[in-house]
Structures are given as structure tokens and as C-alpha cells.
Design a protein with these regions (language model features):
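Flexible, glycine- and charge-enriched loops at secondary-structure boundaries
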Residues: 1, 27, 111, 115
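Single conserved hydrophobic/aromatic residue that forms the stacking wall/gate
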Residues: 1-12
């Protein structure tokens, strides 16, 4: 199918590289990359008994037709490297894991990055060796940055999606401007941070991504 220049809307690809990460290095180099992070991890602590690592990459080329008839195209590279280690001491085994990635080519995983992931996984496992079970019951907890954001997403993220609010099935339907959280809570959805796995040039409706404040000082 031929797309006319009038129909085509080319997005500015400035939030991540258009390089296909799947082809950015040879298969043999991918194996070497995994062997390298395994070697780095094993040298960090004598109690390590097992290291597992995985490397994933994908490259999506999409074309979206908007309700106004415009055609928007985009590319979406994505890579991730994960490492898991098992340590053993005094007949007790514990595990630690780490990893990362984003919208990069595979050369993002430099020796420095590999060492950071390996160190994080090993340190986590070593701490777990002396860890005690958390007490049961209700209590105040402090969540650090990073993965705890998943809790926020699952708790309120889906309820703030447009489809549920349009249909009136969300707990937040019709509550714009009202208090829905503590005055100390502000939630921002930012799809424009360069190279982050949650960032896009355009969303699946063909709109340019932006920085959107969902909850400000407790108000929707």
C-alpha cells in the first residue's frame, strides 16, 4: 500500500535511537556479553554458587491511522539485561537479582553497566543471607524509587486510564478537581524521558507523548 506525502506524518525520533538492537551486535557477541556478566558476578563474592543471566531485545515498526485520517509511523527499540545470583552460607541459600535497559542498542551494556548490575544482585543476595522475616500486620512503610512504582501503577494507574473513565467504570470517574489522595501526593506520567523503556515518540493513538500531571497535591 502506497502512502502519500500528504497522509504521512513523520514523527521526530529524538527520544531514542532508531537502531535495531537485534542486529546491533552479532550473536557471538551476545553470548560473550552474558559470559562477561557471569564472570564479573562470580568474582564479587566467594559464596556465589550460581549465576543466571538473560538478554532480550525487540524492535517494533508501527503505523497508526488516527481518527482524522493522518498516518503516523514510529520505531520502538527495547533492550533488557537481567542477572540473578544464588549465594550459600552456613547451609542457607538466598537469591539476589538486578538488571536494566531501555530504548537503546545493545552497546548500552558496557563493562561499567554490567558491573553495576552484578554488584546490585550480589549485594542483595548477601543482605538476604542475614535477613529476618518481616513482622506481620499493618504498619507504615517507606517505598524507595524504582520498582515500587509498579505498586502505584497497579493501585491507581489502570483506574486513571481514559477508557475506564470514558465508560464511567473507574473509581476516579467524574472526580477531576476533587481530593483523592494525601495533599503530599503528586503523580506525574512522563512519556518523554529520553531512552527510558516507558517513553515513546507517539502513543498508540498517534498522539505525541507528553508530561502529564495526574494527581497534584492530592487532587485529581
Amino acid at each position: 500500500h502506497t502512502i502519500s506525502r500528504r497522509q504521512r506524518q513523520m514523527c521526530i525520533r529524538d527520544r531514542y535511537s532508531p537502531i535495531n538492537p537485534i542486529d546491533s551486535i552479532e550473536s557471538a557477541e551476545k553470548i560473550i556479553l552474558l559470559e562477561k556478566i557471569e564472570s564479573i558476578a562470580k568474582k564479587l563474592n566467594p559464596h556465589i554458587v550460581k549465576v543466571s543471566a538473560s538478554l532480550a531485545s525487540q524492535f517494533d515498526v508501527i503505523l497508526i491511522k488516527t481518527f482524522t485520517g493522518e498516518l503516523v509511523e514510529d520505531i520502538r527499540p527495547l533492550v533488557r539485561l537481567s542477572i540473578s545470583v544464588i549465594v550459600e552460607k552456613n547451609q542457607r541459600r538466598e537469591q539476589g537479582s538486578a538488571g536494566g535497559g531501555g530504548r537503546y542498542a545493545l552497546d548500552y551494556f558496557t563493562d561499567e553497566v554490567l558491573h553495576e548490575y552484578a554488584s546490585t544482585a550480589v549485594n542483595q543476595a548477601i543482605v538476604n543471607l542475614d535477613a529476618m522475616p518481616a513482622p506481620a500486620g499493618s504498619m507504615t512503610v517507606v517505598l524507595g524509587s524504582g520498582w515500587p512504582g509498579i505498586l502505584l501503577h497497579e493501585a491507581i494507574g489502570h483506574g486513571l486510564e481514559g477508557d475506564f473513565n470514558r465508560k464511567g467504570t473507574s473509581a476516579f470517574s467524574g472526580k477531576i478537581g476533587t481530593k483523592v489522595a494525601s495533599p503530599e501526593v503528586t503523580v506525574v506520567d512522563d512519556g518523554t524521558i529520553p531512552n527510558r523503556r516507558g517513553s515513546l515518540n507517539v502513543d498508540d493513538e498517534g498522539n505525541t507523548t507528553s508530561r502529564t500531571t495526574l494527581i497534584e497535591n492530592g487532587k485529581l
